[in-house]
Amino acid sequence: MWFLWILATFIFAKTKSRFYVSVFILTNMMASIHQITAYFTLNAAYVMFFAAAFVYAGSLGMHKRLRNIVIHLTAAAAYGFIFLFALYDPVWFIIKPEWAAVILLTVITLSVEGRFPERLCLFVLGMCQGELLYAAVIRNIAGAAAVGDYKWLSGCSAGVILLVGLTTYEQLAARISQKSKKQGKGATKMS
């Protein structure tokens, strides 16, 4: 989370939204030590991520398209599947299930969404819903489980950093390609 806050505060371009993102991340870090007990024990940072993702999805109009709802539920099911598979058959995992889930959700997000806001929203919604799904299934087996613990928060932060990095890489590659095409056109016109 600290790395996200440093990125948002010092690296990103100065905009009004950058300020809100920085405040959200800082508030989220402070809230991560608090637990909310309802049907599940929820981490306050998890609740903030979940609420912010749903509000942001609503502002983007993602709830109006069936495609986005199906994709976000698919991402949640993939997250839940990874953790349940790791629970019942852990020998198949070479890496930690948290990292496998982050990588899988990042690949799903990058392959179905083109713009960064939709990618971010889909990723966070998939992580939140998947964690809730996993906790609901585990509750019947092992009793009460904490939803949105520090492992989840770390994985979600790492996934967001990965999304920012890969989206920046895509934009950089597109600019380089566009610049090389412009330089190539000038060379053919001169000959």
Question: Whereabouts are the PLM-identified features?
Answer:
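C-terminal transmembrane helix-loop-helix hairpin of multi-pass membrane proteins
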Residues: W2, V112-S191
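Acidic, metal/ion-handling microdomains and their immediate structural contexts
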Residues: T15-V21
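Structural signature of hydrophobic alpha-helical transmembrane segments
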Residues: M1-W2, I36-F49, P90-A100
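Pore- and pathway-forming membrane helices of multi-pass small-molecule/ion transporters and channels
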Residues: W5-F10, V21-I33, F49-F54, A77, ...
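Hydrophobic cores of alpha-helical transmembrane segments in multi-pass inner/ER membrane proteins
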Residues: W2-I11, M48-G61, I103-E113, C156-Q171
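Short juxtamembrane and helix-loop transition motifs at transmembrane-helix boundaries
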Residues: W2-K14, T27-A38, A53-R65, A78-V91, ...
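Membrane-proximal helix-loop-helix units in multi-pass membrane proteins
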Residues: G61-Q129
